[in-house]
């Protein structure tokens, strides 16, 4: 890192969003990662408690979050963990959720006990966001019949405020995301549920004659709708699912991501569903949503088939200024890539981008669109593994797989750079999170795996390209600036927290700049509608950006 720059910047109200002269050329320079978890102090192992009964929840654990909980400028790492089955009780430290403090220089320290975040129940997903705008990011943990909202006290400790905040439990929640759907300056919470389930559910799936039991197909589970909690601004939340018009849309939800895909100033929501059509909830701007997944072209593949949609990211991969949607799925289904073509419509670009051919033999969970080689084009990382640990007995597929990275060539297509990148660890990968963990200007990756140690992929790609990152402080908007749009040249990136599979990455907004050595102009639009313009900005900096009042 060359330094940190704090700016309040010039304000230009009513600026028209437009492309600027600078364009970024794709650089096929190698992307390279090294797993430094063993020497970093990151010793987390995800204990999902596999049983002979093959409870579905066993194969779906693994969400995590990266966020700077203590405000020291270094992103920390939180992992969700399982529990004993069938009791759903964390009977020992092996089942604790874990928080690791970033000590700097890729070293981490377990602070779970002192922070008070070991948790309860069988945990699934994590979402970080400062819901009370006090400058200390809070944490929501989604789980099976037990959700937890932790309030960050600002002294290295968290308080469980679930009950008094009005957050309910009792259903199987997989993932969640913070976003300000009504732009009132307070983050709201969207919680995704999978299906009706209890430990007493004991359907036998597989080949009973051969004594081979497997996890049941999703079709045997009745899906559930998501829950939307409106932040009242006083530390409490109201369930507005019915009022907002989402309560009637039941699905087997896996992940949630939010972005303003039609640039009308109101954040929209995409929910992946397992072997059901995906949901795209268009924000009408009056407190209600319209489900438009089918009409917009993101509910199904181009051939009209639903896939086992797992994780998702909602960012602009082709630098046309509109956020696109990347999804992971099972082997043989490909990883759908939906290109935003404007006017509320998406085109299936899975095969046109070559992601279809490159991903057809993989099963994916976590996913992220980030510029790993800083050439100005977002690449695609996927955390891979099949859902069924006995799949080799029935199909020509494998259970444990290495992760993948597909490099964006800047012409609408990708190439598989996984082998050369060093992604060679075959595990039952699940959630993934993304952040510049050591401040060197390159995005690193953390991946959780069932029954195995977490991976900490340090980005050691050649430092031939430049970059800039923004840490946002909202004043009229939510404190984290979630939902902010930033444009540099032909690039646009949004401040998004929910990402991947059941995971969260709260680490500002990052841009790769290629060989660009100075930036003439940067345009920012905050969720409040406030426009901001920066001029003549240095590269290779972390910019602390505060919303003007």
Summary of predicted features, one role per range:
Residues 54-57, 86-92, 215-220, 270-271, ...:
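Short consensus segments that form the blades of beta-propeller domains
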Residues 74-81, 134-143, 189-193, 268-273, ...:
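Hydrophobic beta-strand segments that make up the repeating blades of beta-propeller
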Residues 42-63, 115-127, 166-177, 221-224, ...:
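Repeat-based blade/solenoid architectures
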Residues 23-32, 50, 54, 354-357, ...:
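Gly/Ser/Thr/Pro-enriched helix-cap/hinge segments flanking short amphipathic alpha-helices
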Residues 113-128, 142-181, 191-219, 223-225, ...:
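Asp-box/WD-like beta-propeller blade repeats and closely related beta-sheet repeat scaffolds
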Residues 24-34, 85-111, 146-160, 206-207, ...:
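Beta-propeller blade repeat segments, especially FG-GAP/WD-type strand-to-loop junctions
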Residues 61-71, 101, 122-137, 151, ...:
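Beta-propeller blade termini
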Residues 80-94, 194-221, 382-399:
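Short, conserved, GDST-rich strand-edge loop motifs in beta-rich repeat architectures
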């Amino acid at each position: 890192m060359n330094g940190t720059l704090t700016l309040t910047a010039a304000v230009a109200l009513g600026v028209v969003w437009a492309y600027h002269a600078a364009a970024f050329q794709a650089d096929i320079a190698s992307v390279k990662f090294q797993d430094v978890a063993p020497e970093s102090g990151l010793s987390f192992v995800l204990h999902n408690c596999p049983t002979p009964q093959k409870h579905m929840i066993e194969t779906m654990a693994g969400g995590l979050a990266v966020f700077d909980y203590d405000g020291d400028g270094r992103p920390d790492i939180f992992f969700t963990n399982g529990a004993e089955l069938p009791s759903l009780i964390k009977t020992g430290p092996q089942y604790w959720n874990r928080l690791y403090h970033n000590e700097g220089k890729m070293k981490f320290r377990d602070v779970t006990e002192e922070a008070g975040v070991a948790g309860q129940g069988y945990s699934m997903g994590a979402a970080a966001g400062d819901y009370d705008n006090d400058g200390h990011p809070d944490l929501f943990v989604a789980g099976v019949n037990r959700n937890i909202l932790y309030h960050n006290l600002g002294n290295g400790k968290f308080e469980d405020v679930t009950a008094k905040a009005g957050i309910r439990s009792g259903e199987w929640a997989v993932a969640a995301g913070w976003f300000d759907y009504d732009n009132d300056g307070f983050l709201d919470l969207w919680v995704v549920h999978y299906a009706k389930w209890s430990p007493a559910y004991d359907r036998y799936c597989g080949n009973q004659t051969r004594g081979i039991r497997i996890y049941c197909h999703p079709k045997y589970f009745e899906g559930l709708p998501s829950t939307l909690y409106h932040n009242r601004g006083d530390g409490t939340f109201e369930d507005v699912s019915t009022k907002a018009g989402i309560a009637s849309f039941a699905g087997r939800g896996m992940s949630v991501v939010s972005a303003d895909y039609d640039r009308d100033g109101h954040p929209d929501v995409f929910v992946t569903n397992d072997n059901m059509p995906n949901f795209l909830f268009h924000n009408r701007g009056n407190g209600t949503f319209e489900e438009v997944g089918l009409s917009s072209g993101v509910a199904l593949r181009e051939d009209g088939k639903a896939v086992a949609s797992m994780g998702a990211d909602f960012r602009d991969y082709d630098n046309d200024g509109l956020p696109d949607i990347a999804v992971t799925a099972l082997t043989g289904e490909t990883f759908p890539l939906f290109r935003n073509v404007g006017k509320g419509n998406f085109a299936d670009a899975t095969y046109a981008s070559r992601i279809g051919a490159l991903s057809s033999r993989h099963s994916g969970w976590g996913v992220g669109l980030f510029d790993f080689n800083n050439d100005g084009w977002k690449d695609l990382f996927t955390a891979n593994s099949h859902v069924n640990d006995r799949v080799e007995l029935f199909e020509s597929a494998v259970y444990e797989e290495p992760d993948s990275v597909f490099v964006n060539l800047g012409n609408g297509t990708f190439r598989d750079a996984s082998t050369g990148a060093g992604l060679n660890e075959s595990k039952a990968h699940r959630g993934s999170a993304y952040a510049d963990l050591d401040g060197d200007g390159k995005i690193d990756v953390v991946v959780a795996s069932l029954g195995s140690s977490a991976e900490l992929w340090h980005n050691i790609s050649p430092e031939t390209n430049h970059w800039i990152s923004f840490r946002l402080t909202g004043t009229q908007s939510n404190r984290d600036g979630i939902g902010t749009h930033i444009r540099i040249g032909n690039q646009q990136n949004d401040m998004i927290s929910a990402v991947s599979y059941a995971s969260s990455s709260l680490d500002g907004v990052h841009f790769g700049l290629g060989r660009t050595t100075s930036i003439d102009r940067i345009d920012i639009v905050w969720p409040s509608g406030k426009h901001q313009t920066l001029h003549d900005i240095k590269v290779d900096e972390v910019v602390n950006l505060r919303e003007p009042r």
